[in-house]
Amino acid sequence: MPIRHPVGYASRMKSKYVDGFLVVVAKKKLADYVTLAKKAGRVWMAHGALGFYECVGDDHPAGCGIPFPKRAKCKRTETVLFSFVTFKSKAHRDAVNAAVMADKRM
């Protein structure tokens, strides 16, 4: 699936653990979501995440499993993003996420 990366931060370290999410966003609110995601990405990276990505699908071809928009039950006025954060390990993820949730910027 071709993707656009409105937000993407990465370090050079290899990741071994990933948190991934499908996020449904109203198309007319996508710019607002990207602004919020950029702020969130900076917070995750400041607390040690190895990478932070927000990917918007441009093309969801049939015959490639269940396309994300169908799986996420998107309306025609919505789009779906595949968002993921990378970490060294599950323990590293747990520590980073705890710090992020305690961060006043969130």
Where are these regions (language model features)?
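Short S/T/G/P-rich N-terminal loop/turn motif that feeds into the first structured element of a domain
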Residues: 2-106
